[in-house]
Amino acid sequence: HAIESIVEEVESSKDSIVDTLERAIQSANRYIRIKSRENEDMNGMGTTVVAATITDDVMYVANVGDSRLYIINSGIRQITVDHSLVEEMVRMGGINRQQAREHQDKNIITRAIGAEDELKIDFFKVKLEKGDFILLCSDGLTNMIEDEEIRMLLLGQKDIVSKAETLVAAANRNGGKDNITVVLIEPFADEVNK
C-alpha cells in the first residue's frame, strides 16, 4: 500500500514536484507507522525508498535509506547518498569505500520509512543528457555488484529488459543475499534510437 499511496499522490497533485514527492513519501511513512502500531507483528517495520520523476530533461529524485539512483552513460554516477552507518563512517574519514562494502554493519540504515513520525527526505535535481540510463535499485544489487561492474554489464546488453535481467542474474551469481530490485529508465530512448 505504501507504494500505491506514493504513486496516487504524485499522479493527482498540482503542486511542485518536490512538494508532491515530499507529501507522498510522508504519507507512506504515516501509513507504515499506523500499521506497525495496530499490528504487533508489524512493529518496527520499515522500508527504504528511491523515487524519481522526469520533466523534459530534468529529473527530480527523492530518497530515504540505502536504495540508490545512478545515472549511467560513459561513466556511472551515484546521485543519492546512502542513509547508513557505514556511509557516515566514510564521510567522516573513518573507513574507505572498499571497507564500507565489506563492513559488518553495512546493512544498518540511519533513515527508513516507518522509523520516525517525521521523516527527513533527501532531494536531488539532475539535468539529463541523451544516452543516459537511470538505474534505481535496492542494496540487494549494490551489495553484490560494484558500480563499475554494473556499468559494464549494462553496456554489454542491447535492450533494456536484458540489461535489467543481466544485473539481477549477476547479483544472484555473486551470492544474492537480499531482495534485488532493479528499475531501468532510458529517458531519451525514442530520440537515441532514431
Locate predicted features:
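PP2C/PPM-type serine/threonine phosphatase catalytic domain
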Residues: 1-194
